[in-house]
Amino acid sequence: GTVQTRTVGEKLSPTGKLNVKRIPLKIRQTTSKVSVSGLANGDLVKTWTSSNRKIVSVSKKGVIKGLRKGKATVTAVLASGKKLSLTVTVQAKTVKTKSITGLKGKLTLKRKGKLALKPVLSPITSQEKVSYMSSNSKIVAVNKRGVITGKKKGSARITVKSGSKRKLIRVTVR
Protein backbone atom coordinates (compact mmCIF):
# COMPACT_ATOMS: atom_id res chain seq x y z
CA GLY A 1 0.00 0.00 0.00
CA THR A 2 0.85 3.67 -0.23
CA VAL A 3 1.34 6.05 2.67
CA GLN A 4 -0.81 9.18 2.72
CA THR A 5 -0.06 12.12 4.99
CA ARG A 6 -2.38 14.98 5.72
CA THR A 7 -1.83 18.17 7.65
CA VAL A 8 -4.85 19.11 9.69
CA GLY A 9 -5.43 22.66 10.94
CA GLU A 10 -2.61 24.22 8.99
CA LYS A 11 -1.73 27.70 10.25
CA LEU A 12 -3.20 30.58 8.23
CA SER A 13 -0.73 33.07 6.83
CA PRO A 14 -1.65 36.51 8.19
CA THR A 15 -2.28 38.72 5.15
CA GLY A 16 -4.90 41.33 4.41
CA LYS A 17 -5.47 45.06 4.53
CA LEU A 18 -8.23 47.60 5.09
CA ASN A 19 -9.49 49.78 2.23
CA VAL A 20 -8.91 52.93 4.37
CA LYS A 21 -6.51 54.05 7.12
CA ARG A 22 -8.71 56.83 8.50
CA ILE A 23 -12.28 58.05 8.07
CA PRO A 24 -14.33 60.98 9.32
CA LEU A 25 -17.90 60.38 10.54
CA LYS A 26 -20.60 62.79 11.64
CA ILE A 27 -22.22 62.14 15.03
CA ARG A 28 -24.90 59.40 14.52
CA GLN A 29 -23.58 58.57 11.01
CA THR A 30 -22.99 54.88 10.24
CA THR A 31 -20.89 53.28 7.53
CA SER A 32 -20.41 49.73 6.27
CA LYS A 33 -17.91 50.85 3.60
CA VAL A 34 -14.82 49.77 5.54
CA SER A 35 -13.68 46.42 4.15
CA VAL A 36 -10.84 43.93 4.43
CA SER A 37 -9.20 42.59 1.26
CA GLY A 38 -6.32 40.29 0.35
CA LEU A 39 -7.11 37.68 2.99
CA ALA A 40 -5.37 34.30 2.87
CA ASN A 41 -7.64 31.46 1.74
CA GLY A 42 -9.76 30.46 4.75
CA ASP A 43 -8.93 33.57 6.80
CA LEU A 44 -11.73 35.84 7.98
CA VAL A 45 -12.49 38.71 10.34
CA LYS A 46 -13.17 37.21 13.78
CA THR A 47 -13.94 40.41 15.68
CA TRP A 48 -14.24 44.17 15.27
CA THR A 49 -13.41 46.38 18.26
CA SER A 50 -13.41 50.09 19.14
CA SER A 51 -10.74 51.63 21.38
CA ASN A 52 -13.42 53.95 22.83
CA ARG A 53 -17.02 52.71 22.69
CA LYS A 54 -18.33 56.09 23.92
CA ILE A 55 -17.03 57.75 20.73
CA VAL A 56 -17.30 54.98 18.10
CA SER A 57 -19.28 51.74 18.12
CA VAL A 58 -18.66 48.85 15.73
CA SER A 59 -20.92 45.84 15.08
CA LYS A 60 -19.89 42.19 14.59
CA LYS A 61 -20.25 42.78 10.84
CA GLY A 62 -17.98 45.86 10.88
CA VAL A 63 -20.67 48.57 10.71
CA ILE A 64 -19.08 51.64 12.31
CA LYS A 65 -21.14 54.39 14.01
CA GLY A 66 -20.01 57.78 15.28
CA LEU A 67 -21.49 58.43 18.73
CA ARG A 68 -19.85 61.61 19.98
CA LYS A 69 -17.07 64.02 19.01
CA GLY A 70 -13.56 62.61 19.27
CA LYS A 71 -11.18 59.98 17.88
CA ALA A 72 -11.07 56.22 18.31
CA THR A 73 -9.27 53.30 16.70
CA VAL A 74 -11.34 50.53 15.13
CA THR A 75 -9.54 47.19 14.86
CA ALA A 76 -10.42 44.09 12.84
CA VAL A 77 -8.89 40.93 14.32
CA LEU A 78 -8.45 38.13 11.78
CA ALA A 79 -8.66 34.39 12.48
CA SER A 80 -4.94 34.24 11.58
CA GLY A 81 -4.22 36.61 14.47
CA LYS A 82 -3.38 39.67 12.35
CA LYS A 83 -4.83 43.00 13.52
CA LEU A 84 -5.86 45.72 11.06
CA SER A 85 -6.67 49.20 12.39
CA LEU A 86 -8.07 52.50 11.22
CA THR A 87 -8.62 55.85 12.93
CA VAL A 88 -12.18 57.17 13.09
CA THR A 89 -12.67 60.89 13.77
CA VAL A 90 -16.21 61.78 14.84
CA GLN A 91 -17.24 65.37 14.11
CA ALA A 92 -20.35 67.51 14.54
CA LYS A 93 -20.25 68.84 10.95
CA THR A 94 -21.40 67.07 7.77
CA VAL A 95 -18.62 64.99 6.18
CA LYS A 96 -17.67 66.90 3.01
CA THR A 97 -16.26 65.53 -0.25
CA LYS A 98 -12.53 66.23 -0.58
CA SER A 99 -12.04 64.65 -4.02
CA ILE A 100 -13.77 62.74 -6.83
CA THR A 101 -11.79 59.97 -8.58
CA GLY A 102 -12.47 56.88 -10.68
CA LEU A 103 -13.54 58.82 -13.78
CA LYS A 104 -11.76 59.25 -17.12
CA GLY A 105 -11.27 62.74 -18.53
CA LYS A 106 -12.35 61.66 -22.04
CA LEU A 107 -14.89 59.07 -23.19
CA THR A 108 -16.16 57.97 -26.59
CA LEU A 109 -19.68 56.60 -27.06
CA LYS A 110 -21.64 55.33 -30.03
CA ARG A 111 -25.08 56.73 -30.77
CA LYS A 112 -27.58 55.08 -28.39
CA GLY A 113 -24.59 53.72 -26.41
CA LYS A 114 -24.90 53.82 -22.62
CA LEU A 115 -22.29 53.95 -19.89
CA ALA A 116 -22.63 54.18 -16.12
CA LEU A 117 -20.26 56.65 -14.46
CA LYS A 118 -18.95 55.36 -11.14
CA PRO A 119 -17.34 58.24 -9.27
CA VAL A 120 -15.41 57.40 -6.10
CA LEU A 121 -15.75 60.03 -3.38
CA SER A 122 -13.03 60.68 -0.85
CA PRO A 123 -13.49 60.27 2.03
CA ILE A 124 -15.69 57.18 1.50
CA THR A 125 -17.96 58.50 4.27
CA SER A 126 -18.79 61.76 2.43
CA GLN A 127 -22.41 62.79 3.07
CA GLU A 128 -22.60 65.12 0.07
CA LYS A 129 -24.76 63.92 -2.83
CA VAL A 130 -23.40 63.36 -6.33
CA SER A 131 -25.09 65.23 -9.19
CA TYR A 132 -24.59 65.00 -12.95
CA MET A 133 -25.10 67.57 -15.71
CA SER A 134 -24.59 67.57 -19.48
CA SER A 135 -23.43 70.71 -21.34
CA ASN A 136 -25.59 69.57 -24.30
CA SER A 137 -28.24 66.91 -23.64
CA LYS A 138 -29.04 66.72 -27.39
CA ILE A 139 -25.62 65.09 -27.85
CA VAL A 140 -25.09 63.33 -24.49
CA ALA A 141 -27.81 62.85 -21.89
CA VAL A 142 -27.13 61.90 -18.26
CA ASN A 143 -29.60 60.73 -15.61
CA LYS A 144 -29.48 61.24 -11.84
CA ARG A 145 -27.79 57.83 -11.38
CA GLY A 146 -24.88 58.84 -13.65
CA VAL A 147 -25.83 56.79 -16.72
CA ILE A 148 -24.80 58.66 -19.88
CA THR A 149 -26.44 58.02 -23.25
CA GLY A 150 -25.08 59.04 -26.66
CA LYS A 151 -27.84 60.89 -28.56
CA LYS A 152 -26.21 62.22 -31.75
CA LYS A 153 -22.74 62.84 -33.23
CA GLY A 154 -20.71 65.56 -31.55
CA SER A 155 -19.12 66.23 -28.20
CA ALA A 156 -20.28 67.60 -24.87
CA ARG A 157 -19.07 67.83 -21.28
CA ILE A 158 -20.51 65.92 -18.34
CA THR A 159 -20.02 67.61 -14.97
CA VAL A 160 -19.94 65.32 -11.93
CA LYS A 161 -20.37 67.33 -8.73
CA SER A 162 -20.31 66.52 -5.01
CA GLY A 163 -20.33 69.43 -2.59
CA SER A 164 -17.78 71.98 -3.82
CA LYS A 165 -15.79 69.40 -5.84
CA ARG A 166 -16.41 68.78 -9.53
CA LYS A 167 -14.97 66.63 -12.29
CA LEU A 168 -15.39 67.30 -16.02
CA ILE A 169 -15.59 64.52 -18.59
CA ARG A 170 -15.42 65.25 -22.31
CA VAL A 171 -17.71 62.82 -24.14
CA THR A 172 -17.51 62.34 -27.91
CA VAL A 173 -20.43 60.62 -29.65
CA ARG A 174 -19.61 58.92 -32.96
Each model region followed by its residue ranges:
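Extracytoplasmic soluble-region selector
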Residues: 1-174
